[in-house]
Regions:
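Active-site neighborhoods and metal-handling regions in enzymes and metal-associated proteins
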Residues: 2-483
Length: 483
């Protein structure tokens, strides 16, 4: 295919040179606007592979219909905080302090960029809105969603009394920001004498807390928060599903791109072209309000493609830049997110050799790993342990004689942060609960032969079986291709 096309272009170019056409064409071309990269990609998007998408199973427990919103609404945050307060009340706690940005985002909806600058969120049971400690660069952002007051320091490291934006420029003493936080909470007021915190305090922090807030006990309630975050609400799952609509279309575009351009392109080009095309689709559909804050938060589709020996490394330290060739393993992978919700979506391919045949060893690894995906789907039932799911998958891998190609556990929990506990691992005895979300990665890797096959999706735990968020097939028709 590639040679024929190159020959046609070469012969056509010679003819144009001979006829003196090229010079005139260049003059005309210089006066015409050329299509942008995005427009060129739109023009070649055939949608052919989208016709192979799986239809939803009417007997399955999901996936849910996609959300029609771009992020979780403020009412959801308020209901979530109310649920958290009820759980705290069961332990006799009337106030909470969270310092993990993931917990702040989950509870309050305050999406922000995390750096070395500490931020914290405090709330009493009787407070209607959260109180924040925040740096100066976020002073507008923190007030734009749900704000009940707070204390601002200028930046890290903060000098006492220094607020250049107010015209106060001075080299004051370096401020201990944990003491700054405690002093702000003291002035705000604490309901009760116990504060739930999202992690244990260091002994040095406990000493400072005892001095600033005498008689107040700090209680680790991180187990409540991670338990809430692990079990997704219907609103979270609907937003998650929406992100996969775009993720699936990206997979179809990448597959069509490979089938169209074959061995003329690199894996890097496929990834970049697909990423540009699908994010143009995504951002054109979202309500971005001309760049206003709180619109389009944490929304993006990232596509990564690798071909050849790099597929044999679970977490490569080399770039994905290799020309696509026949007889190779290929992976199209990506991570999607709308309003922070979405996850991985990987498919493993085998490219036929020059004779149009598929390597038997690759077929074996591909088939066993694909079967493990289906096993995880069926085993993802409320009430079983993570360890049990991992045990059954690893036992199957050993029975099939592919144990030397096993490098890692079958899956990890999935959340806004990406990897989230619990883990489908032999040593994790956490009980699966309905609406927990997991990746799907029973990969097999053969570095000696330069091939590897790993998958992913979002598997949501159900009452009778799990369900997937993606509608991209796992079939030979989709994944075994000839170029």
């Amino acid at each position: 295919m590639g040679a024929t096309r190159r020959g046609f272009l070469r012969n056509s170019a010679l003819a144009m040179f001979g006829g003196g056409f090229l010079g005139r064409a260049e003059q005309v071309s210089a006066m015409q606007p050329s299509p942008s990269l995005t427009d060129r990609l739109k023009a070649q998007a055939s949608g052919a592979s989208e016709k192979l998408f799986l239809e939803p199973d009417p007997d399955a427990e999901g996936p849910p219909p996609p959300a029609d919103y771009d992020r979780l609404p403020l009412d959801w945050n308020k209901r979530t905080v109310d649920r958290f307060k009820l759980r705290l009340a069961d332990r006799g706690i009337e106030a909470f302090l969270v310092r993990n940005p993931l917990n702040t985002i989950y509870l309050t909806g305050y999406w922000h960029t995390t750096t070395e600058r500490p931020e914290a969120t405090f709330m009493n049971a009787g407070d209607d809105a959260p109180w924040f400690m925040y740096p100066g660069l976020d002073r507008d952002l923190v007030k734009s969603w749900w704000f009940g007051g707070g204390e601002m320091y200028f930046d890290f490291q903060h000098a006492e009394g220094a607020f250049p934006h107010d015209g106060k420029v001075q080299q004051g003493a370096q401020v201990d920001l944990f003491e700054f936080l405690l002093d702000g909470i003291r002035r705000h007021g604490v309901q009760g004498n116990r504060i739930g915190v999202d992690g244990e305090l260091y002994p040095s922090e406990l000493a400072k807390a005892a001095k600033a807030l005498p008689g107040v006990e700090f209680v680790d309630v991180s187990d409540i928060l991670i338990g809430m975050r692990q079990v997704k609400t219907p609103e979270e799952l609907a937003l998650w599903r929406r992100s996969y609509l775009y993720h699936d279309r990206a997979h179809a575009f990448a597959r069509d791109y490979v089938l169209t351009h074959g061995t003329d392109v690199t894996d890097y080009e496929v990834a970049m072209a697909t990423t540009l095309w699908i994010n143009d689709q995504l951002y054109s559909d979202l309500d971005l309000a001309d760049g206003a804050v709180n619109h389009g938060v944490r929304s993006r589709i990232g596509i990564y493609v690798r071909v050849g020996p790099v597929t044999a490394v679970p977490h490569p330290n080399q770039p994905y830049y290799n020309r696509i060739g026949r007889g190779m393993a290929l992976q199209v992978a990506g991570i999607s997110s709308i309003g922070g919700y979405g996850h991985e979506n990987y498919r493993a391919y085998i490219i036929a050799d020059e004779k149009g045949e598929f390597d038997p060893h690759m077929r074996k690894l591909w088939t066993v790993s694909r079967n493990c995906c289906d096993m995880q789907l069926e085993l993802s039932v409320e009430g079983v342990t993570c360890s049990h799911v991992a045990y059954e998958i690893h036992k199957y891998q050993v029975r099939e004689g592919v144990q030397q190609y096993v490098y890692h556990r079958p899956a990890h929990g999935a959340g806004v942060e990406g990897h989230q506990s619990p883990y489908i691992a032999l040593g994790d005895y956490t009980m699966l609960r309905k609406n927990m979300c997991f990746s799907e990665e029973p990969g097999l890797y053969d570095p000696a032969r330069g091939c590897g096959f790993n998958w992913s999706d979002t598997i949501v735990v159900g009452e009778k079986a799990g369900y997937r968020m993606s509608q991209v097939p796992y079939s030979e028709e989709w994944c075994w291709i000839r170029l």
